[in-house]
Amino acid sequence: EDDFVRFHPIINSGGDLVNVIPDYVTMESYTRAANVDALLRYNTDINRALRAGADAVGATCELQDLPGYLPLRPDENLRNVLRDNAVALFGEEHVAVGAHNAGSTEMGDVSHLIPVVHPWVGCAKGVLHGANFVLDNEEVAYEKSPEVLAMTIIDLLYDDAKKAEEI
């Protein structure tokens, strides 16, 4: 599970009758992973499996690989600046540096170009992207979290942006 590989398919068109191999099927999917090497390796394996499935039923398989989100690579130095400010505001017991998770975001793409940090803030409950996902702490969401970000910006820009230049 170190590579956090996830494969998300959806069949857009898959025939008209039960128990009949359709003459035409379209499927869209994407593969996510914690690093680019794993992403490429597992995508190759998935493509091989899709072709094998088509071969098994005498079908053809046309694949078109398109780029998706790159894995998120947060900058440790920038993360530490933000973490120190979060600890100052929320207290050590309320701040944790999480491990990689299986989510994906365009911030992953940005993280391959410049140093980034992607903080998660505990101000909501429910399943992320789910119908039951709701904000349950407005103070943290609208006041404290922006304050942590502002403090981080100040730290980065202080002393002619010395810290930002280091990062």
Regions found by a protein language model. Name each.
Residues 95-159, 164-167:
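Zn-dependent metallopeptidase/amidohydrolase metal-coordination segment
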Residues 1-3, 56-61, 92-94, 157-165:
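Surface-exposed helix-capping loop/turn segments at secondary-structure junctions
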Residues 53, 89, 152, 156:
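Short alpha-helical functional segments enriched in proximate histidine and acidic residues
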